[in-house]
């Protein structure tokens, strides 16, 4: 039964990727927007894993297959497939998609038994990063150099606000800590992850942010107790 589930998930991802590739070729949507659709879609897929699979080994195998596919897309000549354009833009070369799959795989191995500890890092990565990137791409006026690249104040503020909203709601529903503590913990986590996102480079925020959130929760286990 697990093998059937694996084939279904793999087929769904391939169809999703082919659809995005078609949209990219049609030039109806901005390349960055398409990348973030892939980002959010991958995150949603990752969030469903604890509800689909019973064995950790199934997701490990699936994750390895995804990594091989993504690496292969980058190796094969882009003129032949055109798939690489879905993963990166002309002005931004990144390995973020590979790091994203690695994050899902890593979080699955260490926290799949605790759905809150597994889900919160992924949701922050999925939504905060995507919204920040889109705001930074289309609406930014104030940019700054981090030493690793260029970021925007608007994008960083968006990352902070989105993370804060996510944390507030998660701790409200999945924790017994008091309201004041929820506000303070959410504020602290939002500030720290925003800083981490700012100083990350080449898509490494897709690794740094979720694992930092996981370690934060692991060191403060009472935050996930209800």
Predicted segments with their positions:
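Hydrophobic transmembrane alpha-helical segments in integral membrane proteins
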Residues: 1-11
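Interhelical loop and helix-boundary elements at the membrane-water interface
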Residues: 3-4, 18-59, 71-166, 173, ...
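Glycine/aspartate-rich loop-and-adjacent alpha/beta segment that forms the canonical ThDP
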Residues: 13-16
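Eukaryotic helix-linker segments that join adjacent hydrophobic helices
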Residues: 63-64
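A short structural micro-motif
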Residues: 67-69
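Alpha-helical transmembrane bundle and helix-membrane interface signal
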Residues: 173-180, 226
């Amino acid at each position: 039964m697990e093998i059937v589930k694996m084939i279904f998930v793999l087929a769904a991802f391939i169809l999703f990727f082919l659809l995005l590739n078609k949209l990219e070729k049609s030039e109806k949507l901005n390349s960055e927007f398409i990348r973030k659709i892939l980002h959010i879609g991958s995150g949603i897929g990752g969030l469903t894993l604890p509800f689909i699979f019973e064995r950790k080994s199934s997701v490990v195998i699936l994750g390895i297959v995804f990594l091989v596919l993504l690496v292969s897309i980058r190796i094969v000549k882009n003129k032949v497939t055109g798939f690489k354009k879905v993963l990166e833009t002309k002005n931004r070369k990144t390995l973020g998609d590979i790091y994203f799959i690695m994050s899902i795989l890593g979080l699955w191995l260490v926290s799949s038994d605790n759905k809150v500890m597994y889900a919160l890092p992924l949701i922050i990565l999925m939504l905060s990063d995507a919204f920040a990137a889109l705001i930074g791409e289309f609406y930014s006026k104030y940019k700054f150099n981090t030493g690793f690249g260029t970021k925007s104040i608007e994008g960083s503020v968006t990352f902070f606000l989105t993370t804060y909203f996510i944390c507030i709601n998660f701790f409200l529903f999945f924790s017994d800590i008091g309201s004041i503590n929820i506000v303070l913990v959410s504020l602290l986590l939002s500030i720290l992850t925003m800083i981490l996102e700012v100083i990350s480079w080449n898509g490494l925020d897709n690794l740094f942010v979720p694992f930092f959130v996981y370690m934060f929760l692991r060191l403060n286990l009472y935050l996930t107790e209800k």
